[in-house]
Design a protein with these regions (language model features):
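Amphipathic alpha-helical packing segments from all-alpha helical-bundle domains
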Residues: 100-125, 131-146, 176
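An amphipathic alpha-helix adjacent to DNA-recognition modules
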Residues: 3-6, 10-14, 18, 23-27, ...
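C-terminal peripheral helix-coil segments that are non-catalytic and often amphipathic
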Residues: 150-184
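Protein-protein interaction and targeting regions used for scaffolding, dimerization, and localization
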Residues: 116-117, 127-135, 153, 160-163, ...
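Amphipathic alpha-helical segments that line or abut small-molecule/effector binding pockets
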Residues: 74-89, 138, 142, 146, ...
């Protein structure tokens, strides 16, 4: 029942974002739209931004599913772009109402989930310290998130496939090369 309520709250927030900016939406608005009381909202989330973050993480889980290997990372990243695009009014509203850093905070778990699995696979039989793997993941995460934030800022006009294809061409082989440099 808890997941059902959370999904209903998420849908209410997304409905409200079609009508007004995030900064003008209250917990009461969401509760009214959802047909629950405010305390039920607070049972599940500490504030609206907590709901936004949860929504982004849930979208990431659905988008990535099993697309977290070296062979499928492009498909996984494309699915993140597509999930963001499917929620365009929601994402653009959040992007315009909060600082870029906040949107980055929402995107980071999506991208990190993808990258860490890919890096673990690429590291294969290599002995590499965990903090070095994390560092490599962080560098790629900045690239991926930076591209996505610029795409969002530009109103998601460019075809995500082109972005992912160009990125794949540019970084092909670089992750394995970076990991080799950290090999013990």
């Amino acid at each position: 029942m808890s997941q059902v309520t959370k999904r209903a709250l998420e849908q209410s927030l997304k409905n409200l974002l079609l009508k007004k900016p995030l900064t003008k939406i209250t917990v009461g608005d969401i509760a009214d739209d959802c047909g629950i009381n405010r305390m039920t909202f607070y049972y599940h989330f500490k504030d609206i931004y907590d709901l936004v973050e949860w929504s982004c993480l849930e979208d990431a889980k659905r988008a990535l599913d099993e697309k977290k290997t070296y062979e499928t990372w492009q498909q996984g990243l494309l699915q993140i772009f597509e999930a963001v695009q499917e929620n365009k009014p929601f994402i653009l509203n959040v992007y315009r109402c909060v600082h870029r850093e906040q949107v980055e905070k929402y995107l980071r778990p999506l991208v990190d989930r993808l990258l860490l699995d890919v890096i673990d696979e690429e590291a294969g039989g290599m002995t590499i310290r965990a903090e070095d793997k994390q560092f490599v993941a962080q560098v790629y995460s900045y690239i991926f998130i930076g591209l996505m934030l610029d795409w969002i800022k530009d109103d998601m006009r460019e075809d995500p496939r082109q972005i992912v294809d160009r990125l794949a061409r540019m970084i092909k082989g670089s992750m394995a090369a970076a990991l080799l440099r950290f090999k013990l």
